[in-house]
Structures are given as C-alpha cells and as structure tokens.
Amino acid sequence: MNEIKKKQIAILGSTGSIGTQALQVIEEHPELYEVYALTANNKVDLLIAQARKFMPEAVVIANEEKYAQLKEALSDLPVKVYAGAAALCQIVESGPIDVVLTAMVGYAGLKPTMNAIRAGKAIALANKETLVVAGELINQLARQYRTPILPVDSEHSAVFQCLAGEVGNPIEKVILTASGGPFRTCTMEQLKTVTKVQALKHPNWEMGAKITIDSASMMNKGFEVIEAKWLFGVQPGQIEVVVHPQSVIHSMVQFEDGAIKAQLGMPDMRLPIQYAFSYPDRINSSFDRLDFSKCTNLTFEQPDTKRFRNLALAYESMYRGGNMPCIVNAANEVVVAAFLRDEISFLGMSDVIEHTMGQVSFVQTPTYDDYVATDAEARRIARELICK
C-alpha cells in the first residue's frame, strides 16, 4: 500500500491565535501534515517551544534582535534559523512547501503572500489585510501563477463551502454574519468611555488582541466585506452584513432563485483551518459538535453603522476603490495600536481613520509601489492626527 505523501505546511505567524490553532490541527493529523517552516514576529520563547515540538526544516524570527536567542536555543537541533523580513519572504519559496498559511497580522503579510503565490504555493489565507490592501493585485498574481487561495476566515470559509457545487449558478447576495462584538447593545454614550479591557473580551471567539479590537469596532467585518469582494468576484452591493450574536451560522449565500445556503458549526477556528488544509476533502476531527437542542434562539439584526462607523468607512473605501482600502487599513493599524496604549478613545479611532481617508493621496489604479507609499503616508498622517 502506497504511503500518503504528507502535505508540507509553512505557517507565517505560528505564535499567534490562528498559528497555534493550526498547529493543533497538524498535531491531530500527523499522518497527513508536516510542519516545514514556522515564523514569528517577536514571541521567540513560544517559537522555540514550537520548533522543539514540531521539528520544522526552518524557523524565521522577523525581529532580528531575537535571532541570537533563537539560534542558541535551537543549536542542538537540525533546524535552520533565519531572521528578518527578507528571510520571511524567501522561506515561503522553499521547494517542498505545499501550503502556506498566512496567519500574520496586518499589512506585513502582503509581501510574503505575494512571494508564496509567485512560487506556486497554495495559500491558506488568514491574513485578510492582504486582500484589503491589494486585492486586485493578489487576484492577478493568483490567476497568473494558477495558485489557489483558500479562505481561513470562518465567514469566507463558510461562503466557500456554500459555493461548492454551484459553478455557473449566479450569486445574488453574499451574507456575512457578525457577532456584533462585546459592545453590540451599548449606546453612543456608553461607547465614549469603553476601555481596552472591555474591548478585548469577545463574547464568542478566541482571537489575538488586534483582531479582537477590530471585531469590537466592526472594522474586522468591514475588512471581511472587502475580502469577500475579491475572493468571490461579487460587487460591493451584493455583500450584506447581518448581526447574528450566537455565531452559529458562519455565513450564507443567496442565489438568483432566492434559495439561501448557510454553513453552521461551533465557533472554532480550527474547523476552517482544517478545511483549508484538507480541501477538497473533509477529514475527521475531535472538535466539539453543534448541539441543536441548545440552539434554541438564533437571532438576526441589522448592523448600526452610526454607532459602528468603521463598517461604513470600510464600505466607502470599497466603493471608492483604488488605494482607499489600503489607506483605511494603515490608519486602522495605527489607531488600534494607539487604543491598546490608551492614547485614543474607542470612538476616536473612527475619527482618525475618516480624516486620514481625506488627506492621503488617492491613486485609482495602484501598483505594488503605490501600496507601499500609501501605507507609509497613511500611517504618518494617522499618527499626526492622534498626536493633535
């Protein structure tokens, strides 16, 4: 009997929430998957522990100041150790790699994702900012190099699964569900005084700090709307957001005959991660199952874009196109970092993003170099606005 060739996986951002859960998936299926490379930004101690456990071919620490510590700690293992942004971009091109999981946070994921696509690697996309910033460019590259992009976000994985078997059937609407976050029922007055401690308590999902704040402000859902446009080839007007506090229905697709397909499951990121790894197959898992006897109250409501302006700003950037989503992403990364340092209020984040949108040079048909310049300019302006 022929032995199944194990898929070689590279995880960009292995020490974050998605990365650690991806390693749980791999650990559950050692007969199918093998870790080829692990990368991290700063969490060197966790990266060391992961390397010792999973014995990858190589590890990369983006922060070059941590290189010596990493190198010394792994000196007794046959693991290659690299550091820096350039190494991050090069490691994804390694011949044996089959799948690159892009689980890095923010704009930093763009360049390595582009390199992985050019190298013909299947992309398990968890870094939504890549498509927010440069969706058109990424799609062009994916077509050129015939590289599959498999969504890892639970919502986009849900849509992806709903579209299985529907080739040629026109989509009328993509319906992305949102939990509404921890402040769903808060008044504008209450939102003025919310703290980072409150914002970091998501009701349903275990996530990293940045995406948890984005979920609280609904910018995460705005980014997911933009991501859906590029992943599924739909127009902005075909993407609807519905608040579904229980997070049981992960998203839906409505077809031209009015029929709606939905994907349901437990709010567990390991499920979409595993599907991205195993696609087009489904494989067994030990993860919790949905108990319908406990799903006695599934509710839906419209998002309030007056209280959660970030969702409206994301839609506006998508309609305007060009480098505008890149501007919004850069400004958002700056304001979220400032909010986590207690330098800006929760509602103040939207003000800075909106003003940044009005001040950065607009480019209708941006190149990669335009995105780089836009990101730098938007960050500078957002920081200046925070300091005023």
Curated annotation (Swiss-Prot):
Residue spans crossing the bilayer: none
Classification via SUPFAM superfamilies: 1-deoxy-D-xylulose-5-phosphate reductoisomerase, C-terminal domain (SSF69055), Glyceraldehyde-3-phosphate dehydrogenase-like, C-terminal domain (SSF55347), NAD(P)-binding Rossmann-fold domains (SSF51735)
Cofactor(s) needed: Mg(2+); Mn(2+)
Catalytic activity: 2-C-methyl-D-erythritol 4-phosphate + NADP(+) = 1-deoxy-D-xylulose 5-phosphate + NADPH + H(+)
Pathway assigned in UniProt: Isoprenoid biosynthesis; isopentenyl diphosphate biosynthesis via DXP pathway; isopentenyl diphosphate from 1-deoxy-D-xylulose 5-phosphate: step 1/6
Residues engaged in binding NADPH: 15-18, 127, 129, 208
A GO term for molecular function: NADPH binding
InterPro entries with a match to the protein in the record: DXP_reductoisomerase (IPR003821), DXP_reductoisomerase_C (IPR013644), DXP_reductoisomerase_N (IPR013512), DXPR_C (IPR026877), DXPR_C_sf (IPR036169), NAD(P)-bd_dom_sf (IPR036291)
Binding site for 1-deoxy-D-xylulose 5-phosphate: 128, 154-155, 179, 202, 215, 220-221, 224
EC number of the protein: 1.1.1.267
GO biological process, alphabetically ordered: isopentenyl diphosphate biosynthetic process, methylerythritol 4-phosphate pathway involved in terpenoid biosynthetic process
Alphabetically ordered keywords of this record: Isoprene biosynthesis, Manganese, Metal-binding, NADP, Oxidoreductase
Job of this protein: Catalyzes the NADPH-dependent rearrangement and reduction of 1-deoxy-D-xylulose-5-phosphate (DXP) to 2-C-methyl-D-erythritol 4-phosphate (MEP).
Family of the protein in this entry: Belongs to the DXR family.
NCBIfam families per UniProt: Dxr, PRK12464.1
Annotated HAMAP family: DXP_reductoisom (MF_00183)
Protein name: 1-deoxy-D-xylulose 5-phosphate reductoisomerase
Source species: Bacteroides fragilis (strain YCH46)
Gene: dxr
